[in-house]
Amino acid sequence: STNFNLMFFNCDALVDPDFSAWDVSNVTDFSFMFSGCALLNTDSMANWDTSNGTNFSSMFTSCPSFNGDLSGFDFSSTTSLFSIFNGCTNFNRDISMWDVSGITNFGNLFTSCSRFNQPIGVWDISSATRINGIFNSATDFNKPLPWNTSLVTNMSSTLRSMTSFNQDISSWDINQVSNFNLFMYSTTISTANYDALLIAWDAQGAMAYSGTVSFGTSQYTSGGAAEAARTSLIAKWGGITDGGAA
């Protein structure tokens, strides 16, 4: 079969299967394959040839035990990694070597991955248009993210509820972003990082977004360039919610 959609959906009996001999080189649809497999945890997919896979959406959604080796996965035939690890609360494997340069949709990729903290700042996400919810409730994540976001239009809940996150994302290009809903809601970055963000983002000029942008409870330095940039951004967008002046 070339379609593995829902193959083991909600299969509680799947714990440590040996998939090492499986030839998946012709499979195109892996969507929801292991979704809801609460006890699944295996390294036996490490050598799978996924190069023909076009749909990986929610492949491991709601697999709270899963922490398997997927370092060899090939995404050259797909443009979406939507929700693959959503709810994988135990997942924390190094996938920094993945080639994601052709991926446009990273939506909800690590949502509720509360242990995940791997160096994926090296990823080339220059094709991305959606990174909405990618780190929503990824409570342990705190790695640099010097990403090229120049094509991104949706940053809704991108850095939401990240209790450990404190990085400088001032280099992010946000000109095309039309959805900033709950962007950094319930997240706090340092005043230095927030100041840098405000100044750099305001300098990007005109914005596509109209509405309020949440920076959680992050605080800015009053009476200087950061406050001036914040005032300017409020005029461009319509509003900012944050922790006020430091």
Summary of predicted features, one role per range:
Residues 1-246:
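Negatively charged
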